[in-house]
A protein has these predicted regions:
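Catalytic-core "active-site belt" of small-molecule-metabolizing enzymes
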Residues: 2-204, 241, 245, 253-263
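A conserved acidic, glycine/proline-rich C-terminal tail/linker
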Residues: 208-237
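A short pocket-lining beta-strand/turn micro-motif at the edge of beta-sheets
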Residues: 219, 224-227, 244-246, 254-256
């Protein structure tokens, strides 16, 4: 793809996103054919939307998630500033076709992680993290048949990014805890609807975090101080509808909350 084709694809994605519409897929003249081209469209999307990348997300961190959207591994996407909300926020679902919520561990960095030749170790990544937050992601796609378009087009679609609720910071010591075994419960309208753990996220949220850092490193993209990484859903995605109230309960770590409307 040349730069004009990349820009055209980004404009089509952002046009559908901002209008609350969906498209079958990107037309052949501006369709990414591999993951590199998909990431190039994703980067152009931030310029077209005039939105900062406040953080990063990881889609398809479980085998079930990968099978659902027909990809062979996880996908990195950007959390645009406009769609990052505080704990307790209300999100409008009127244009959301996926209508699911995901409970996630979110890590925030106190320093830049520059591009380097060698892969970062878990210890190196963890040393750059100063906060663990509790999050709820509300993904979405701008494609009608998002399970069929393939990894390159899903990356162009920002790895199905949409809304992100950043809940409270975990105040208890967590770096010496086994996050893989940490239980996460989701309650919808007061009733428990899903139970999972950090093990559902590439085996561990910290493993997923390290994967994301090195995926960016491999592509020459650094992580910046104060950016966050939300590491994927710990539970089976929970169906949601306007009027629902959701709580992601991380036990002694705390809870993240949000509600849904339809305007």
């Amino acid at each position: 793809m040349d730069s004009s084709e990349t820009e055209e694809a980004a404009r089509m994605i952002w046009g559908a996103w901002s209008a609350g519409e969906v498209i079958p897929e990107l037309p052949e003249g501006c369709r990414p054919l591999n993951e590199l081209e998909g990431h190039q469209v994703q980067a152009a999307l931030t310029r077209v939307a005039r939105q900062d990348t406040e953080g990063w997300k990881i889609a398809a961190t479980s085998k079930a998630g990968q099978q659902h959207i027909n990809v062979s591994g996880p996908l990195a996407g950007r959390m645009l500033a406009k769609f990052v909300c505080p704990d307790g926020a209300e999100v409008d679902l009127s244009s959301n076709q996926m209508r699911v919520a995901e409970a996630e561990f979110v890590f925030r960095f106190w320093k830049n992680i520059p591009v380097q030749q060698d892969p970062y170790s878990l210890a190196e990544v963890l040393e750059a993290v100063d906060q663990l937050q509790l999050g709820i992601e509300i993904p979405d796609s701008r494609y009608i048949g998002f399970t069929r378009v393939g990894a390159a087009q899903l990356l162009a679609d920002n790895a199905c990014a949409s809304w992100m609720i950043l809940g409270p910071e975990v105040k208890v010591a967590w770096k010496d805890r086994d996050l893989a075994e940490h239980e996460v419960r989701v309650l919808k309208n007061g009733a428990e609807v899903a139970v999972g753990s950090g093990r559902n996220v590439l085996g561990s949220p910290l493993k997923a975090l390290t994967w994301l850092v090195n995926d960016l490193r491999r592509r020459g993209q650094m992580l910046y101080r104060h950016q966050f990484v939300t590491t994927g859903t710990c539970v089976t995605p929970v169906p949601i509808a306007p009027g629902d109230a959701l709580v992601a309960d991380f036990g002694e770590f705390g809870q993240a909350r949000m509600t849904f409307s339809s305007n």
